[in-house]
């Protein structure tokens, strides 16, 4: 084929012998400026290329490609394509790992990519700064103890169930599945259905109708809940992956991050949270779900968070990996000890991180209505 102009070496026993063949002729092969690998175009050939690359400097390797319909040089020779073999040899490209891509290779997919749809939050003030939330993102919601994180998350769950056709998965580690359903049905009925006295005055038929409207769909379950006792990192990650892949769930809520850490008590909290956040990020990228994560705060000097103290990213409990790996971090601030009931029940929404638009700061206020068990958008009370 090359008329003796170029050195040609063969593997003694096919692709499986690549390592031994190279070792036996290493000094000779390594003496050349570059080496063209012309292995079979199949899985065994690809593995042989990977093994050969490990044994030489990557910049020395070029990969020969075959025309469509031909597996190797033998196929081309039998078809009489001698000139074409020479062309393939001269056109061999320098080896490049699959995860390193030239920008020009991305042009077509860049131009033809589908529009990334956003889902709006239930509150206009939050949408103004964030432009909603999207699949493939991880949003962390944080506040002090007893500040209404679960109420905000429940409103988000209800919003997803009623305003999108998507399936929702929830992992509430501090409450029973019964309490989760009570909360969502209560939002639907605009009453605190989790309270005994409220359930007593609600007709069973009304509650059942609300349940059916929320959770029954022709396509299957609208809501899937985690009802396990195990809190280990691996268990929670496996359940999120199962929800996404086996049940086609698009949105998952994990409430809360720090309780998962209590199930993996080995090692220090910071490293455990780093490990969990990294795995959560990997699952989000792998499955393209939208993930909401609830996180607690560390105690700080100055005004306590429970008395309205301002929150910053450095207050996130345990690890800065929470802030670094989240697409969005939303803080809830409230003075739950205020003597003024209006102030006591008003939550400030503060964006601490916003990878999508870059806008941060106070974005609005939510007022809790105990009679309806709902959070509604409001203006800042004069007393705050």
Identify the function of each model-found stretch:
Residues 1-109:
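TOPRIM fold recognition
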Residues 196-201, 224-230, 261-274, 304-314:
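Flexible beta-alpha connector loops of hexameric P-loop NTPases
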